[in-house]
């Protein structure tokens, strides 16, 4: 398009052919916060009951959260308080605009080492946003069963559930496939089980979970299978 991409700092990535992002100015940051707010307002006007602020998967909010992708020295960078300011200001602005009767969920990735997102910072981040007016927290774990190499055997779900208030429901997502996986995640402290891949191949997946032996077909899916998905 010829438009230079923007980010928290000047960054590049494999596949960008040497193109670097432009570090956002103070004006651009505040304008983007307003853009998130305007999007939430449109959702409310359209009849939705809430929005999820996507701070995971290396998208823009996530780029502000990472130590590697956010190397700013102003108030939008530095420690986790500074690096989370973009997200917290979005939460504050959206809540002010949509009122108390509209749900706000926040989604984060607990660990993305390439971006400089580490578990300790993510736990601190959750403590910060749990004190704000959010209604749900969504942790996108890539794999909810993964172990963290820190001598602590507790799952990511259990660690986050331990530090967030019981009044805030926890959604946990990543590599859940069958009913046993879902039950394990609930037992670890998730209030809601999030899925992606299995839901694409089996959109009626939740209706089969009552069967503890349910084993949905795994990828790769055939063209015929996907063509017949409701």
List each model region and its residues:
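Flavin-dependent oxidoreductase catalytic cores
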Residues: 1-230
């Amino acid at each position: 398009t010829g438009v230079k991409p923007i980010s928290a700092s000047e960054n590049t990535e494999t596949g960008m052919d040497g193109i670097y992002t432009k570090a956002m100015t103070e004006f651009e940051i505040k304008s983007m916060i307003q853009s998130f707010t305007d999007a939430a307002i449109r959702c409310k006007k359209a009849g939705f009951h809430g929005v999820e602020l996507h701070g995971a998967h290396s998208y823009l909010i996530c780029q502000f959260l990472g130590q590697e992708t956010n190397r700013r020295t102003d108030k939008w960078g530095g420690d986790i308080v500074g690096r989370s300011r973009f997200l917290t200001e979005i939460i504050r602005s959206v809540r002010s605009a949509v009122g108390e009767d509209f749900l706000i969920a926040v989604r984060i990735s607990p660990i993305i080492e390439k971006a400089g997102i580490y578990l300790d910072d993510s736990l601190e981040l959750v403590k910060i946003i749990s004190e704000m007016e959010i209604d749900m927290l969504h942790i996108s774990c890539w794999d909810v069963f993964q172990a963290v190499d820190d001598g602590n055997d507790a799952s990511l779900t259990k660690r986050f559930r331990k530090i967030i208030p019981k009044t805030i429901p926890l959604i946990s997502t990543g590599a859940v496939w069958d009913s046993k996986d879902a039950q394990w995640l609930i037992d670890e402290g998730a209030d809601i089980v999030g899925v992606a891949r299995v839901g694409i191949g089996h959109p009626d997946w939740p209706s089969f979970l009552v069967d503890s032996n349910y084993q949905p077909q795994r990828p790769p899916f055939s063209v015929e299978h996907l063509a017949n998905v409701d």
